[in-house]
């Protein structure tokens, strides 16, 4: 059981509210745009007020030539017009002067307030406002003419040409005939149904008394000249007065615009019936204003927008809070079973009490989505995902195929790895409950294969027939687990277990990537100057020119070398020239290219760093948002292409991707079907049940831990999980691969989560200051299916794939492993061990759990991780599956060390522990109560995840 916002461990890691049901166009409302702005799922069900675009027009040029100029605009945040630069400022949190709010309140209390005005045009609106003022007919006419004067808007183009004043300020009439998208790029980023509000402020010499008016239109109308965007206007505010107060009218205009941009004030004023309601809303705003001491803050500084918006829940009236609290609680419980600890299991984990009942329910749930699983893949983003995952899958197949060939002495190899990956993966994508899962060989299963082969060799057993019976028993055991709905045990896989497993395999992944590079350097050694071990000489036939004389000579420097009869330093005579002249190149480095090792390291780290940089550029300030999105989505693909291009340009003989070119088993003399017994005795088919039991535990733990991670509700998957169906498919494929002598396959967490990461949907357009909204994952079956089909035909793509350097693929593997390890919450707690207390970030966890207890919990996890690594690396690796089960047992034992409240924050609660926590528990109570605790805002925000790329 997790707490809201605990998923990323830091209090700031709760993401903005995003609606998964929004269309992928990105034009749907973002955080705070439905209902009172800033309200999320539960609150938006109570009210759906449209987004309000507020524009401040200021009267400038007194006393010479009066004109209205746009000087500010608001959506979520304020944008000021920098007059000198002729451009809009970056969106920032507005700061107000308290006297301006007080003067605004006084002006509105004594001025004109028209609620539900029936005006149908700007002229009618101005007439109603002016008629309410006690002015002479002449002044009334002047005021009316002034208010009808067309303002000058600043429409910033997307070009790089410097703006002159004549271009920066354009008359609205000049753009009336231009297409809307060319008039204002901001218009494209507003959701459908957005409305406008105009605030007019300034000094007017012929006025003797301040003039204030606030108008709410019953039916919004387009007051075209007043705002830069052609939107129906709902509110109109006028603040004018004699030129005696300096910039006070400008600040009052800003105050009015900020009020209208405030969610709670806007919600209240939309429902106000009389002037007291309007003033009460303003007073409520004043009660929540935070003042900054003048001597501790630069008033000209602009506060950047927060990364994540706080919830507006507790700012609304008590009755609305009660309704939204219930609605929010219901939505929150549905949002993430891990975050909010539901008291009833999710549908996929409800016990039916019938044989294969869970499997039947999974099939029924997934059948209705089957057609859309293919139609939803018709999107350009899926092409990037296919290319990225295909290269990762092919590299993984080659890597594990080579390792498996070494471990089994050629009984299985790269060809079996390709064939098994293609057939098993494609079948799984077609029939699985979670088609986003990518099947692959995994490290723990490879360890078991190595041990099984060693056992067969030591006892002179026929390996493949023995392995066949192990696979048959594993299939039987897994089918029994499916029949008895054993997948319900995943409720006991808390974050403690998941992090231990993911951290272990992440380290294995990083270790293997680095190990492969070290092996490559050994194969292509670095030639250090002056090293006799890497010499290369040209030997000529004749007297004294023989090998014994060369090897026995005491060569201490270049002169000694050149004085040996018949020998010439190869630095002066390359091996090809030596051969042409009748000599013979002699020495260990005659056929070694000295640049291979260093250049391979360059490709390795270039692809690794490029993938990280391009992934992070998606959330940077560089380039337009469309370019950033493309670079982020294609980060790994671009890193691979960059490495290939660099390798091709320099033309060095780096090791390339090797793909089998012949379709036949690696072990000569055997057919594709494995004989049931071979040379083994019959009773071995029964004895195989014992290792099969251990392998079944490993398969179950590996598959279901991956499934739990993949199906976390914060990923906003809409089509549900299929724990029972996935395990059933893996069990059937175990029988198939065992019969053909192919590798065993299970869910590969690293590639599966990389698959999800490549398919994440975000809003395409965001209003200024708003981060892109996480909309969910593009759930479909086609990308995985195409990946595995391409893997199967890769034998015929060898002429193309042979140009991909292996160091580049090792760099991508390192990237996935590092990204996985850095995203695990456990690693962030390990970092606390190295931080002085005063430098530790402000985390919710540290507010509720003593630091010593946090360190103790982290130390226990480190000890478990070290134990798993030792067991994996020793002959005792046969008990590795039991050690994974041991993680669950250790987590259960932690109940004797930590209190339920501490475990609630440090980890998740097991089903039995949830019953020990009362409904009115003190810590999580503020999640739904709407109280005023300092944590409630931070804990209240739902999580839109940065996909955690774990490992396989």
Swiss-Prot record:
Glycans are attached at residues 546, 569, 920, 931, 948. The chain crosses the membrane at residues 385-405, 413-433, 470-490, 501-521, 593-613, 634-654, 681-701, 727-747, 784-804, 807-827, 870-890. Keywords: Cell membrane, Glycoprotein, Ion transport, Membrane, Sodium, Sodium transport, Transmembrane, Transmembrane helix, Transport. Residues 12-22 have a biased composition (Basic and acidic residues). GO terms for molecular function: active monoatomic ion transmembrane transporter activity; chloride:bicarbonate antiporter activity; sodium,bicarbonate:chloride antiporter activity; sodium:bicarbonate symporter activity. Residues 1-41, 915-938 are annotated as: Disordered. InterPro entries: Band3_cytoplasmic_dom, HCO3_transpt-like_TM_dom, HCO3_transpt_euk, Na/HCO3_transpt, PTrfase/Anion_transptr. Belongs to the anion exchanger (TC 2.A.31) family. GO terms for biological process: saliva secretion; sodium ion transmembrane transport. Electroneutral Cl(-)/HCO3(-) antiporter that favors chloride ion entry and efflux of hydrogencarbonate and sodium ion across the basolateral membrane and may participate in salivary secretion. Also mediates Cl(-)/HCO3(-) exchange activity in the presence of K(+) as well as Cs(+), Li(+), and Rb(+). Does not contribute to Cl(-)/HCO3(-) exchanger in the apical membrane of the upper villous epithelium. The keyword DNA damage does not apply. The gene is Slc4a9. GO terms for cellular component: apical part of cell; basolateral plasma membrane; membrane. It is found in: Basolateral cell membrane. It catalyses: 2 hydrogencarbonate(out) + chloride(in) + Na(+)(out) = 2 hydrogencarbonate(in) + chloride(out) + Na(+)(in); K(+)(in) + 2 hydrogencarbonate(in) + chloride(out) = K(+)(out) + 2 hydrogencarbonate(out) + chloride(in); Li(+)(in) + 2 hydrogencarbonate(in) + chloride(out) = Li(+)(out) + 2 hydrogencarbonate(out) + chloride(in); Rb(+)(in) + 2 hydrogencarbonate(in) + chloride(out) = Rb(+)(out) + 2 hydrogencarbonate(out) + chloride(in). Cl(-)/HCO3(-) exchanger activity is substantially increased in response to 5 uM isoproterenol. Cl(-)/HCO3(-) exchanger activity is increased by both forskolin and coexpression with the catalytic subunit alpha of PKA. Its main location: membrane. It is a multi-pass membrane protein. Expressed in submandibular gland (SMG) duct and cortical collecting duct (CCD) of kidney. Lower expressed in duodenal villi. The keyword Transmembrane helix applies. It holds the Pfam family Band_3_cyto. This is Anion exchange protein 4. Disruption phenotype: Homozygous mice lacking the Slc4a9 gene have no obvious phenotypical abnormalities.
């Amino acid at each position: 059981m997790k707490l809201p916002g605990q998923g990323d461990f830091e209090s700031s890691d709760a993401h903005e509210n995003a609606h998964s049901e929004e269309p992928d166009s990105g034009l749907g409302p973002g955080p705070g745009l439905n209902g009172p702005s800033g309200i999320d799922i539960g609150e938006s069900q109570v009210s759906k007020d449209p987004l309000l675009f507020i524009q401040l027009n200021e009267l400038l040029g007194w006393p010479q030539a009066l004109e209205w100029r746009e000087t500010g605009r608001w959506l979520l945040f304020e944008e000021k017009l920098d007059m000198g630069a002729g451009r809009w400022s970056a969106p920032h949190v507005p700061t107000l002067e308290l006297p301006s709010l007080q003067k605004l309140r006084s002006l509105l209390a004594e001025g004109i307030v028209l609620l539900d005005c029936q005006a149908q045009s700007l002229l009618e609106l101005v007439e109603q406002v002016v008629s309410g003022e006690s002015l002479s007919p002449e002044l009334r006419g002047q005021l009316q003419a002034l208010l009808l004067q067309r303002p000058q808007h600043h429409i910033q183009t997307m070009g790089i040409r410097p703006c002159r004043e004549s271009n920066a300020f354009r008359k609205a009439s000049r753009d009336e005939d231009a297409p809307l998208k060319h008039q204002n790029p901001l218009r494209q980023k507003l959701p459908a149904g957005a409305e406008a509000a105009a605030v007019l402020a300034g000094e007017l010499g012929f006025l003797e008394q301040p003039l204030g008016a606030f108008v709410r239109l019953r039916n919004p109308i387009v007051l075209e000249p007043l705002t830069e965007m052609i939107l129906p206007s709902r509110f109109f505010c006028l603040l004018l007065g004699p030129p005696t107060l300096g910039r006070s009218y400008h600040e009052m205009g800003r105050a009015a615009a900020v009020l209208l941009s405030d969610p709670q004030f806007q919600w209240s004023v939309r429902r106000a019936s009389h002037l007291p309601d309007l003033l009460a809303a303003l007073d409520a705003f004043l009660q929540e204003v935070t003042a900054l001491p003048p001597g501790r803050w630069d008033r000209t500084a602009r506060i950047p927008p927060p990364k994540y918006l706080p919830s507006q829940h507790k700012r609304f009236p008590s009755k609305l809070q009660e309704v939204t609290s219930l609605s929010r609680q219901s939505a929150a419980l549905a949002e993430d079973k891990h975050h909010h600890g539901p008291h009833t299991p999710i549908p996929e984990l409800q016990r039916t009490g019938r044989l294969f009942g869970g499997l039947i329910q999974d099939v029924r749930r997934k059948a209705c989505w089957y057609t859309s699983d293919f139609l939803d893949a018709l999107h350009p983003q899926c092409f990037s995902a296919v290319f990225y995952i295909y290269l990762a899958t092919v590299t993984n197949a080659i890597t594990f195929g080579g390792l498996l060939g070494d471990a089994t002495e050629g009984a299985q190899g790269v060809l079996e790895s390709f064939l098994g990956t293609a057939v098993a993966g494609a079948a799984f994508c077609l029939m699985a409950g979670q088609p986003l899962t990518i099947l692959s060989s995994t490290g723990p299963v490879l360890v078991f294969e190595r041990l099984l082969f060693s056992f067969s060799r030591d006892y002179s057993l026929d390996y493949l027939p023995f392995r066949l019976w192990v696979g048959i028993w594993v299939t039987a055991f897994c089918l029994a687990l499916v029949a008895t709905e054993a997948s319900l045990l995943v409720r006991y896989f808390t974050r403690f277990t998941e992090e231990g497993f993911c951290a272990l395999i992440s380290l294995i992944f990083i270790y293997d990537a680095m190990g492969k590079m070290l092996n490559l350097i050994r194969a292509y050694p670095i030639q250090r100057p002056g090293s006799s071990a890497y010499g290369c000489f040209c030997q000529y036939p004749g007297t004294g020119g023989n090998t014994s004389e060369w090897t026995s000579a005491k060569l201490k420097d270049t002169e000694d070398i050149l004085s040996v009869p018949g020998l010439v330093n190869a630095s002066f005579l390359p091996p090809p020239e030596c051969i042409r002249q009748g000599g013979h190149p002699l020495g260990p480095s005659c056929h070694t290219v000295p640049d291979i090792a260093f250049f391979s390291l360059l490709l390795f780290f270039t692809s690794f760093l490029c993938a990280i940089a391009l992934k992070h550029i998606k959330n940077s300030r560089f380039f337009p948002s469309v370019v950033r999105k493309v670079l982020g989505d294609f980060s790994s693909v671009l890193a691979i292409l960059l490495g290939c291009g660099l390798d091709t340009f320099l033309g060095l003989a780096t090791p390339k991707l090797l793909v089998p070119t012949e379709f036949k088993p690696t072990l000569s003399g055997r057919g594709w079907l494995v004989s049931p017994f071979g040379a083994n005795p019959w009773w071995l088919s029964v004895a195989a049940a014992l290792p099969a039991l251990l392998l079944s535990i490993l398969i179950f733990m590996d598959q279901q831990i991956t499934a739990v991670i993949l199906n976390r509700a914060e990923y906003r998957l809409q089509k549900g999980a299929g724990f029972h169906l996935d395990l059933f498919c893996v069990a059937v494929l175990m029988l198939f691969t065992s019969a053909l002598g192919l590798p065993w396959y299970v869910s590969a967490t690293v590639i599966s989560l990389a698959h999800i990461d490549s398919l994440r949907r975000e809003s395409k357009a965001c209003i200024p200051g708003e981060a892109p909204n996480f909309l969910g994952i593009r759930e479909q079956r086609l990308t995985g299916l195409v990946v595995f089909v391409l893997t199967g035909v890769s034998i015929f793509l060898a002429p193309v794939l042979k140009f991909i350097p292996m160091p580049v693929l090792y760099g991508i593997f390192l990237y996935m492993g590092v990204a996985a390890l850095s995203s695990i919450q456990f690693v962030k707690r390990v970092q606390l061990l190295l931080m002085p207390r005063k430098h530790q970030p402000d985390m919710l966890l540290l507010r509720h759990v003593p630091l010593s207890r946090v360190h103790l919990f982290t130390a226990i996890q480190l000890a478990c991780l070290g134990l798993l690594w030792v067991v994996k690396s020793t002959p005792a690796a046969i008990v590795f599956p039991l050690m994974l089960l041991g993680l669950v047992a250790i987590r259960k034992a932690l109940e004797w060390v930590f209190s339920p409240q501490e475990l609630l924050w440090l980890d998740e609660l097991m089903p039995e522990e949830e019953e020990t926590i009362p409904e009115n528990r003190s810590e999580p109570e503020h999640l739904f109560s709407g109280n005023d605790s300092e944590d409630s805002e931070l804990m209240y925000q739902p999580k839109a995840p940065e996909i955690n790329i774990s490992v396989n």
